[in-house]
Amino acid sequence: MASNFQDDEREQAMRMLFDLYKDESEGRSGVDAYLDLDGMTIPFELKTTSRGSVTTVRDFGPDHIEKWRDRHWLIGFFMQGREYYKYGSPAMMAPWIAEKGKYIEPDFSLAQLAPPKLNLQDMYNILGEKERYTYEDARYIQKRQYSKATYLARQDLDAGYSPQRMLEIVRDRTAYLIKRGSTLNNPHIPLSYFKNWAEITENHALILRQMVKAYLENE
Protein backbone atom coordinates (compact mmCIF):
# COMPACT_ATOMS: atom_id res chain seq x y z
CA MET A 1 0.00 0.00 0.00
CA ALA A 2 2.83 2.40 0.87
CA SER A 3 4.35 1.74 -2.55
CA ASN A 4 1.06 2.71 -4.21
CA PHE A 5 0.99 5.99 -2.31
CA GLN A 6 4.57 6.68 -3.35
CA ASP A 7 3.77 5.95 -6.99
CA ASP A 8 0.73 8.25 -6.83
CA GLU A 9 2.84 11.04 -5.34
CA ARG A 10 5.52 10.61 -8.00
CA GLU A 11 2.95 10.61 -10.79
CA GLN A 12 1.41 13.80 -9.46
CA ALA A 13 4.89 15.33 -9.28
CA MET A 14 5.46 14.27 -12.91
CA ARG A 15 2.26 15.96 -14.01
CA MET A 16 3.40 19.18 -12.39
CA LEU A 17 6.97 18.91 -13.68
CA PHE A 18 5.90 18.30 -17.29
CA ASP A 19 2.84 20.57 -17.18
CA LEU A 20 0.39 17.72 -17.75
CA TYR A 21 -3.07 17.28 -16.27
CA LYS A 22 -5.42 14.50 -15.26
CA ASP A 23 -9.13 14.45 -16.05
CA GLU A 24 -10.47 13.78 -12.56
CA SER A 25 -13.92 12.93 -13.94
CA GLU A 26 -12.45 9.70 -15.34
CA GLY A 27 -11.66 8.36 -11.86
CA ARG A 28 -8.69 6.29 -10.79
CA SER A 29 -8.96 3.96 -13.79
CA GLY A 30 -8.81 6.84 -16.27
CA VAL A 31 -5.91 8.07 -18.37
CA ASP A 32 -2.90 8.96 -16.20
CA ALA A 33 -2.28 12.34 -17.83
CA TYR A 34 -3.01 14.50 -20.84
CA LEU A 35 -0.84 16.91 -22.80
CA ASP A 36 -2.41 19.69 -24.86
CA LEU A 37 -0.31 20.40 -27.94
CA ASP A 38 -1.20 22.38 -31.06
CA GLY A 39 -4.92 21.84 -30.59
CA MET A 40 -4.52 18.12 -29.86
CA THR A 41 -5.03 16.29 -26.58
CA ILE A 42 -2.36 13.61 -26.15
CA PRO A 43 -3.00 10.76 -23.66
CA PHE A 44 -0.09 9.62 -21.50
CA GLU A 45 0.70 6.54 -19.46
CA LEU A 46 2.85 7.51 -16.46
CA LYS A 47 5.20 5.02 -14.81
CA THR A 48 7.91 5.28 -12.19
CA THR A 49 10.60 2.87 -11.06
CA SER A 50 13.35 2.72 -8.47
CA ARG A 51 14.42 -0.83 -9.38
CA GLY A 52 15.08 -0.66 -13.10
CA SER A 53 12.25 -2.67 -14.60
CA VAL A 54 8.88 -0.98 -14.94
CA THR A 55 5.68 -2.57 -13.67
CA THR A 56 2.57 -2.27 -15.81
CA VAL A 57 -0.89 -3.63 -14.89
CA ARG A 58 -2.30 -6.43 -12.76
CA ASP A 59 -4.19 -8.23 -15.54
CA PHE A 60 -2.72 -7.49 -18.97
CA GLY A 61 -5.09 -8.53 -21.75
CA PRO A 62 -6.45 -7.49 -25.17
CA ASP A 63 -8.14 -4.42 -23.71
CA HIS A 64 -4.74 -3.03 -22.71
CA ILE A 65 -3.32 -3.72 -26.15
CA GLU A 66 -6.13 -1.67 -27.67
CA LYS A 67 -5.92 1.06 -25.02
CA TRP A 68 -2.17 1.47 -25.36
CA ARG A 69 -2.09 1.43 -29.17
CA ASP A 70 -2.04 5.24 -29.36
CA ARG A 71 -0.80 5.98 -25.84
CA HIS A 72 2.37 7.98 -25.18
CA TRP A 73 4.55 6.97 -22.23
CA LEU A 74 6.50 8.98 -19.69
CA ILE A 75 8.66 7.04 -17.26
CA GLY A 76 10.40 8.41 -14.19
CA PHE A 77 13.58 6.69 -13.01
CA PHE A 78 14.66 7.14 -9.38
CA MET A 79 17.80 5.05 -9.19
CA GLN A 80 21.21 5.19 -7.54
CA GLY A 81 20.71 8.74 -6.37
CA ARG A 82 19.64 9.96 -9.82
CA GLU A 83 16.29 11.21 -11.04
CA TYR A 84 15.60 11.32 -14.76
CA TYR A 85 12.78 10.71 -17.19
CA LYS A 86 12.29 9.08 -20.57
CA TYR A 87 9.60 9.63 -23.17
CA GLY A 88 8.28 6.78 -25.28
CA SER A 89 6.08 7.31 -28.31
CA PRO A 90 3.42 4.75 -29.31
CA ALA A 91 5.83 3.47 -31.97
CA MET A 92 8.60 3.02 -29.39
CA MET A 93 6.33 0.99 -27.12
CA ALA A 94 4.72 -1.01 -29.94
CA PRO A 95 7.28 -3.88 -30.04
CA TRP A 96 6.89 -4.68 -26.33
CA ILE A 97 3.09 -4.50 -26.51
CA ALA A 98 3.06 -6.69 -29.64
CA GLU A 99 5.30 -9.28 -27.97
CA LYS A 100 2.98 -9.58 -24.98
CA GLY A 101 -0.05 -9.62 -27.25
CA LYS A 102 1.37 -12.52 -29.24
CA TYR A 103 2.02 -14.43 -26.01
CA ILE A 104 -1.60 -14.27 -24.84
CA GLU A 105 -3.24 -14.49 -28.29
CA PRO A 106 -3.79 -18.28 -28.40
CA ASP A 107 -5.33 -18.31 -24.92
CA PHE A 108 -7.85 -15.64 -25.84
CA SER A 109 -8.61 -17.49 -29.07
CA LEU A 110 -9.51 -20.49 -26.92
CA ALA A 111 -11.83 -18.26 -24.89
CA GLN A 112 -13.76 -17.58 -28.10
CA LEU A 113 -13.63 -21.08 -29.56
CA ALA A 114 -14.32 -23.27 -26.53
CA PRO A 115 -17.57 -21.92 -25.00
CA PRO A 116 -19.79 -22.45 -28.10
CA LYS A 117 -18.79 -26.12 -28.11
CA LEU A 118 -20.52 -26.69 -24.76
CA ASN A 119 -23.96 -28.23 -25.22
CA LEU A 120 -27.06 -28.87 -23.14
CA GLN A 121 -25.74 -32.19 -21.89
CA ASP A 122 -22.65 -30.46 -20.55
CA MET A 123 -24.87 -28.01 -18.69
CA TYR A 124 -27.05 -30.86 -17.37
CA ASN A 125 -23.94 -32.57 -16.05
CA ILE A 126 -23.29 -29.50 -13.90
CA LEU A 127 -26.78 -28.43 -12.81
CA GLY A 128 -28.96 -31.42 -13.53
CA GLU A 129 -31.76 -31.55 -16.09
CA LYS A 130 -34.66 -29.19 -15.35
CA GLU A 131 -37.39 -27.42 -17.29
CA ARG A 132 -36.78 -24.19 -15.38
CA TYR A 133 -33.64 -23.03 -13.61
CA THR A 134 -33.72 -20.59 -10.71
CA TYR A 135 -31.88 -17.40 -9.84
CA GLU A 136 -29.88 -19.46 -7.35
CA ASP A 137 -28.86 -21.88 -10.12
CA ALA A 138 -27.63 -19.01 -12.28
CA ARG A 139 -25.74 -17.42 -9.40
CA TYR A 140 -24.20 -20.80 -8.56
CA ILE A 141 -22.60 -20.70 -12.03
CA GLN A 142 -21.80 -17.02 -12.60
CA LYS A 143 -21.29 -15.99 -8.97
CA ARG A 144 -20.54 -12.25 -8.81
CA GLN A 145 -19.76 -11.79 -12.49
CA TYR A 146 -23.32 -10.61 -13.11
CA SER A 147 -25.06 -7.84 -11.21
CA LYS A 148 -28.47 -8.66 -9.80
CA ALA A 149 -30.01 -6.53 -12.54
CA THR A 150 -28.23 -8.61 -15.19
CA TYR A 151 -29.35 -11.88 -13.61
CA LEU A 152 -32.96 -10.68 -13.70
CA ALA A 153 -32.65 -9.29 -17.23
CA ARG A 154 -31.40 -12.64 -18.53
CA GLN A 155 -34.43 -14.55 -17.24
CA ASP A 156 -36.50 -15.77 -20.17
CA LEU A 157 -39.11 -17.63 -18.11
CA ASP A 158 -41.33 -16.45 -15.27
CA ALA A 159 -38.81 -16.00 -12.42
CA GLY A 160 -36.36 -18.34 -14.03
CA TYR A 161 -34.30 -19.52 -16.97
CA SER A 162 -34.88 -22.01 -19.76
CA PRO A 163 -32.27 -24.74 -20.38
CA GLN A 164 -31.03 -22.87 -23.45
CA ARG A 165 -30.63 -19.62 -21.51
CA MET A 166 -28.81 -21.42 -18.70
CA LEU A 167 -26.47 -22.94 -21.29
CA GLU A 168 -25.67 -19.40 -22.47
CA ILE A 169 -24.81 -18.46 -18.88
CA VAL A 170 -22.54 -21.49 -18.55
CA ARG A 171 -20.82 -20.48 -21.78
CA ASP A 172 -20.37 -16.93 -20.46
CA ARG A 173 -18.75 -18.30 -17.32
CA THR A 174 -16.45 -20.55 -19.32
CA ALA A 175 -15.28 -17.65 -21.48
CA TYR A 176 -14.67 -15.52 -18.39
CA LEU A 177 -12.60 -18.23 -16.69
CA ILE A 178 -10.41 -18.80 -19.75
CA LYS A 179 -9.87 -15.06 -20.25
CA ARG A 180 -9.13 -14.57 -16.57
CA GLY A 181 -6.51 -17.28 -16.67
CA SER A 182 -5.04 -15.89 -19.88
CA THR A 183 -4.15 -12.42 -18.66
CA LEU A 184 -0.58 -11.67 -17.62
CA ASN A 185 -0.04 -10.66 -14.03
CA ASN A 186 1.83 -7.34 -14.04
CA PRO A 187 4.32 -7.97 -16.86
CA HIS A 188 7.49 -5.95 -16.31
CA ILE A 189 9.25 -3.90 -18.96
CA PRO A 190 13.00 -4.54 -18.50
CA LEU A 191 15.38 -1.64 -18.00
CA SER A 192 17.25 -2.70 -21.15
CA TYR A 193 14.17 -1.84 -23.22
CA PHE A 194 14.73 1.85 -22.51
CA LYS A 195 18.49 1.78 -23.05
CA ASN A 196 18.53 3.93 -26.18
CA TRP A 197 15.80 6.32 -25.11
CA ALA A 198 16.91 9.91 -24.45
CA GLU A 199 16.98 11.11 -20.85
CA ILE A 200 15.10 14.23 -19.83
CA THR A 201 16.86 15.95 -16.95
CA GLU A 202 16.05 19.65 -17.45
CA ASN A 203 13.53 21.94 -19.14
CA HIS A 204 11.17 19.01 -18.71
CA ALA A 205 7.93 20.47 -20.08
CA LEU A 206 9.59 22.09 -23.08
CA ILE A 207 11.67 19.07 -24.07
CA LEU A 208 8.70 16.71 -23.76
CA ARG A 209 6.66 18.87 -26.09
CA GLN A 210 9.51 19.00 -28.58
CA MET A 211 9.81 15.21 -28.54
CA VAL A 212 6.08 14.63 -28.92
CA LYS A 213 5.87 17.16 -31.74
CA ALA A 214 8.80 15.55 -33.55
CA TYR A 215 7.11 12.15 -33.31
CA LEU A 216 3.78 13.45 -34.60
CA GLU A 217 5.43 15.24 -37.51
CA ASN A 218 7.22 12.06 -38.60
CA GLU A 219 4.38 9.63 -37.90
Could you tell me what each predicted segment is?
Residues M1-I42, T48-E219:
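Nucleic-acid endonuclease domains
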